[in-house]
Amino acid sequence: DYRQRLLNVRVMLSLRKALFDRLLHLPLPRLWDMKTGGILSRLTGDIDTTTGLLQMAVVSPAISVIRLIIAVGLLLSLNWRLALTALAIIPGVLLMSLVFARRVKPIYRSVRKDAEEIDGRVGETFSGIRVVRAFRGEPRERQDYMRGRHTVLRKELFAHRRELVLWGSWGLLMSAVNVAIVWYGGLLYTGGRASIGDIMAFQWYSFLLLNPVWSIVNTFSELQRSLAAMERVFEVLAMDDDKPDRPGAVEAPRVVRELRLENIEFEYRPGLPVVRDLNVTVPGGTVVALVGRSGAGKTTVTDLVARFHDPTGGRILLNGIDIRDLTLRSYRDLLALVQQEVFLFDGSVADNIAYGRHDATQADVEDAARRANAHEFIVRLPEGYETFIGERGVKLSGGQQQRLAIARAILASPQILILDEATSNLDTESEQLIQASMADLLAGRTTFVIAHRLSTIRRADLILLLDEGRVVERGTHRELMAARGGYYDMVVRQMESDAHGVHGGVLQ
């Protein structure tokens, strides 16, 4: 029992490792379709449901088959005619089990899908607990949760009723076998081909046949739940990786001399282009500001540079090499990302700053924090750099979160920086500290910044105004203001808003 349990634990651990690794490398659109609840459901619930599958699918049936072979041998040695009568049960059992599997496994598959939806909803509820409480949504969330759980319960009870039918049918088959043995044994006795003792002994030994057959049927019944969960696990394992390296892929150069986007086209869905005919050459160390209204394609451009997606047309060249001909790992080593909505992990301040540099020393972490103007507030925290900041950094203010994200990017020391500037309004002191740390972050790096603040845009070497995925204007701030086009109109509107105290200096 210990060895079987140990084997189960090792198999489940290997399965979890393989599944987690595959999930880490799935294309982003697939992950977005699965949702967090679906991912957690497969990693935990589905694999937990398969615990003991090896025992059920291999060990128990193997033991039952050995017992079945021994029983058949004994029965044949006693009376081959009666043995054939008893063996007639096996085709009926096989047919009954196949019918049961066809009807029950879809139910269990549906149960796992419903459980996934419930897990996802629970995750959303507690991620947005402020909204739930502010809008008095607790009764609705409780009702939705219980409705989902009752649906799962009804389906499980329905499947269990099907199992009861299977067990009842098995009882009828056993009774039929006993009746057949007595009836046919009586015929053999009257014909002088069997004694009463033979018939009684045969009837007793027939249980040696029926018990392993029943064990196989029972195992087959229990197996359906595990197989439904296992199918969902292997469905993910069978998915293709995000971007496997091309044959002959080479390591990325360590210094960025030029990044060129050449005839770039991209669409999430066929026939709906998001980026069209994008051409731009970015010398190393250049700061490129992407501006434009919401939905213009700014984030998609930065996602293409980061290779979160590959273009559907055109190519991106790093020092003249198509980035798809570089190993993804070495290319991503050149990158750092600062998102508009800062993402911090539920760990210590130091762990979050060093996330991109696992070999960083405490001195490295503190130096990055100082350059991001974060050191002073960090040392005032209860445990300093070892203070745990909660899931998504909920124990920190918005300005503190942004400075930690900047410190993380500074410590990563990237050649290429992708910055989606935060649009949230901050107090004057936080705004000034962040702007000062931004100057350190951008210095000497090839940077693509989705810019919202005029101060950041003015700092850019090249400004691209995007509209419906196309670059409609390009140049420096001075050049575009002199051209008095769409960029000029945006800046004027922003300055008028600032004059009336609107938006807090955020360029919309």
Q: Where in this protein do the model-derived segments appear?
A:
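Membrane-embedded alpha-helical segments of multi-pass transporters/permeases
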Residues: 2, 68, 72, 76, ...
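ABC-type nucleotide-binding domain
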Residues: 245, 252-508
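Transmembrane-helix motif of ABC transporter permease domains
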Residues: 1-13, 21, 32, 85, ...
